[in-house]
């Protein structure tokens, strides 16, 4: 009996997580295949393959995407393990190699790299943080070198057992006078990414969003202007013997946001917010899920800097009428 893993670690689930099975028998037989989550030892699914000598199975429909995946407030610059899940296939006493899955939705190459939709030149406001998702081989050592324009520097080292790690970058790790940060990330001594951050004072009329991008990384951006707040209500009116009254009322509060004028690469990344499965807004120091109600985002396709507008629903609820 041979079980061969055909899919690499961090294969997007929509592409399938494939295993090849060869019983090495001369005649077909029924095979019971167990799909096991390694962290818990739980058998998440069982497949019965009838009259089989060789088969290919896709375990993606039974895989649970890591659910604890949200932007976390960080007051310090640090590495941490990114949420992942590991699975294996068992037939009798024979087990396959394990496969690691995460929330990434784009194909991961074999070489280590930083998974992000935003360009390498970015903006950070005072007391904000950004996070970078790094995908590499299991058991790799990551290094980060952060150099500030004030002359400060910070060097971090991190061993990732799963092959996925997050670098949280906080402006609070540096002097208040910092105006620029240059971040270089290495894996096993080879450079895999560099980023430049312009650090500026934060204005009052701003809103910081985080969202799960098309590639599966959590991106951050502070919208420069929350230029309109809107509260609307929809009433259901009924006629009674005493006259016309409101039977129910549903209220909603939303916020309209405008980005900075940005280059095309940044605008294209921000446009993904409209179709993102998860969008958060920073409120009172914590991250809260919000709904994007913008049906359409328009921007320039010809390279000129432009901006986008978003409408965010903060809450919607039934309002008591007595």
Go through each PLM region and give its residues.
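Preference for solvent-exposed, low-hydrophobicity sequence contexts
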Residues: 1-205
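Extracellular/virion structural assembly segments
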Residues: 2-12, 26-28, 126-138, 169-178, ...
């Amino acid at each position: 009996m041979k079980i061969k893993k055909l899919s690499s670690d961090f294969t997007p689930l929509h592409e399938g997580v494939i295993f090849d099975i060869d019983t090495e028998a001369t005649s077909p037989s029924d095979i019971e295949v167990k799909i096991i989550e390694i962290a818990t030892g739980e058998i998440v699914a069982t497949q019965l393959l009838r009259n089989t000598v060789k088969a290919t199975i896709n375990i993606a429909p039974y895989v649970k995407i890591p659910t604890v995946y949200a932007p976390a407030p960080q007051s310090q610059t640090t590495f941490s393990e990114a949420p992942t899940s590991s699975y294996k296939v068992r037939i009798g006493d024979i087990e396959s190699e394990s496969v690691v899955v995460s929330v990434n939705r784009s194909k991961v190459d074999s070489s280590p790299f930083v998974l992000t939709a935003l360009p390498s030149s970015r903006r950070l406001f005072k007391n904000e943080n950004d996070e970078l998702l790094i995908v590499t081989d299991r058991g790799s050592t990551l290094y980060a070198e952060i150099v500030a324009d004030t002359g400060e520097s910070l060097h971090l080292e991190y061993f990732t057992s799963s092959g996925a790690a997050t670098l949280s970058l906080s402006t609070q790790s540096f002097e208040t006078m910092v105006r620029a940060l240059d971040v270089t990330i290495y894996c096993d001594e080879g450079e895999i990414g560099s980023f430049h951050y312009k650090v500026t004072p934060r204005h009052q009329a701003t809103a910081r969003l985080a969202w799960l991008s098309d590639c599966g990384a959590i991106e951050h951006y502070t919208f420069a202007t929350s230029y309109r707040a809107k509260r609307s209500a929809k009433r259901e009116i009924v006629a009674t013997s005493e006259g016309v009254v409101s039977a129910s009322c549903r209220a909603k509060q939303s916020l309209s946001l405008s980005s900075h004028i940005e280059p095309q690469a940044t605008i294209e990344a921000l446009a993904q917010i409209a179709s993102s499965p998860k969008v958060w807004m920073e409120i009172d120091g914590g991250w809260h899920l919000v709904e994007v109600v913008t049906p359409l985002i328009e921007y320039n396709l010809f390279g000129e800097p432009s901006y986008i507008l978003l409408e965010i629903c903060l809450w919607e609820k039934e309002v008591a009428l007595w």
